[in-house]
């Protein structure tokens, strides 16, 4: 038994490196099959402090193959990810401000709905007091398939205290709207190392942690996202160099976004 465990430990880094390289190559070579769609649009939403912007920065690090200067958090960003050759990958992340308790704080659920339908212009700054209207400059009256959201990603921090019921209700409302629009959905659970000492000690314990599994199960029940569509990730924060096991988790989630988005585009050609 001891020999078996030591063997698993010794081959784990090789497995992670191989899978990381495979997923990275897949993302790098992906191109939308439809000429009118230049990129896949991924909308990320969640509670305040969930780690949405940090994940986007982590994706930038992985695709560039080095640590990069992190982008500052804002009310919205439309960010095309770039690789080592200064070529842009066909991915755009829409990062909106976090959902908060109350009606006059955080982003409005109606604004997220407009974004999913493609009615929000890139770079528009959301107003927590007043939602976007057809008269606003940031409103796109005639969205193309390229403008619409192709994947909805709900982000939840594993280390967050209990999420307010009203925030969870907003999350469910956004999901229900996405379902009506046929937009595929998935979720990411961030800050997994801060939430579990076993994972903080060694990231390969991510799939062994009973604590994390319960967190994911509770989150699945609360917002209605299946367990097999919830991906644990660790964002880069205080590291100065890339790590294969961190990259692997980021790329696993990214690969699923590409697959889901590609499916949506193919189904909505007409």
Which residue stretches match the model-derived regions?
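N-terminal pre-Walker A segment at the start of P-loop NTPase domains
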Residues: 2-36
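A structural motif corresponding to the C-terminal end of an alpha-helix
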Residues: 148, 181, 219-227
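Glycine-rich phosphate-binding P-loop
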Residues: 40-64
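C-terminal structured domain segments
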Residues: 210, 214-225, 237-240
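Switch- and interface-adjacent substructures of P-loop NTPase systems
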Residues: 30-36, 59-183, 191-211, 234-239, ...
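Short hydrophobic segments within beta-strands
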Residues: 43-45, 94, 188
